[in-house]
Amino acid sequence: MPPWFRREKAGIRTTREEQNEMPEGQWVKCPETGEITNRRELEENLLVFPGSGYHFGMDSHQYFGFLFDDGDYDLHDTDLRSVDALNFEDRKPYSQRLESAVEETGQNEAVQAATGSVGGHPVSMAGMDFSFIGGSMGSVVGETVARAIKRAYTEGMPLITIAQSGGARMMEGALSLMQMAKTSAHLTRLDEAGLPFISILTHPTTGGVTASFAMLGDIHIAEPDALIGFAGPRVIRETIGSDLPEGFQKSEFLQEHGFVDMIVDRRRLRRRIIRLLNLLME
């Protein structure tokens, strides 16, 4: 614990009024080192913990805010809504799960599509939100990503996706699996147009998202220590009946084995993307 956070004198009391002035969650603890920092400092550091470099999760709007020039962007397809076509129910009906996710996140779905400029280059971008039903890909997520890709190749823009997902959305059955083929087919059109696709892989990126558009980029950028794979480590371990290699499915392991092109600290991500766009769009 930092010395400036340690109480030096016993018996010091704080009044109820002073306690109420302290914002909830003002102090944040690093899950790796146990160190503590101020939430404002953490937010100014793009949710990367000072010192340890631990990357906390971000939502799509937070990524858009620091990647687009001056944080200026236009959202698209926010009117799309998922429906419970199968009347699916596990612990609670899928329709209720959707309502809860919308209320808790303030988002319409697990992905947001936007256009704007990055380093002066017009860009089509799609960012996922893990907080919305685990960032799972259902029909609306697939359609939104497909439209973002189409927007890129019809308007002559590069594409950037920010993946964070638990995979296909089981509540939509085969409808969710169809999104893998849909997004992949649209990426073929983008490739035919000769436009670059930069895929950013954050923690975690798994399942059907990994098995489709997230791993079809021209350049794959991963955040440090991100879990990236198809099935999760526990499922694989139980299937093969043996322990996995150290760090298996982490971004560093994947880079070492050629599945990821580069690992970039979030604080340097925008600069790296601008350099890549300058090279690819010449």
From Swiss-Prot:
Any one Gene Ontology cellular component term annotated for this protein: acetyl-CoA carboxylase complex
Main location: cytoplasm
Pfam families in alphabetical order: Carboxyl_trans (PF01039)
Reaction equation(s) it catalyzes: N(6)-carboxybiotinyl-L-lysyl-[protein] + acetyl-CoA = N(6)-biotinyl-L-lysyl-[protein] + malonyl-CoA
Pathway the protein contributes to: Lipid metabolism; malonyl-CoA biosynthesis; malonyl-CoA from acetyl-CoA: step 1/1
Ranges of residues in domain CoA carboxyltransferase N-terminal: 26-282
InterPro entries: AcCoA_carboxyl_beta, Acetyl_CoA_COase_Trfase_b_su, ClpP/crotonase-like_dom_sf, COA_CT_N
Subcellular location: Cytoplasm
E.C. code: 2.1.3.15
One example GO MF annotation: acetyl-CoA carboxylase activity
Signal peptide: none
Keywords: ATP-binding, Cytoplasm, Fatty acid biosynthesis, Fatty acid metabolism, Lipid biosynthesis, Lipid metabolism, Nucleotide-binding, Transferase
Protein family: Belongs to the AccD/PCCB family.
Oligomer status and interactors: Acetyl-CoA carboxylase is a heterohexamer composed of biotin carboxyl carrier protein (AccB), biotin carboxylase (AccC) and two subunits each of ACCase subunit alpha (AccA) and ACCase subunit beta (AccD).
Described function: Component of the acetyl coenzyme A carboxylase (ACC) complex. Biotin carboxylase (BC) catalyzes the carboxylation of biotin on its carrier protein (BCCP) and then the CO(2) group is transferred by the transcarboxylase to acetyl-CoA to form malonyl-CoA.
The protein, known as: Acetyl-coenzyme A carboxylase carboxyl transferase subunit beta
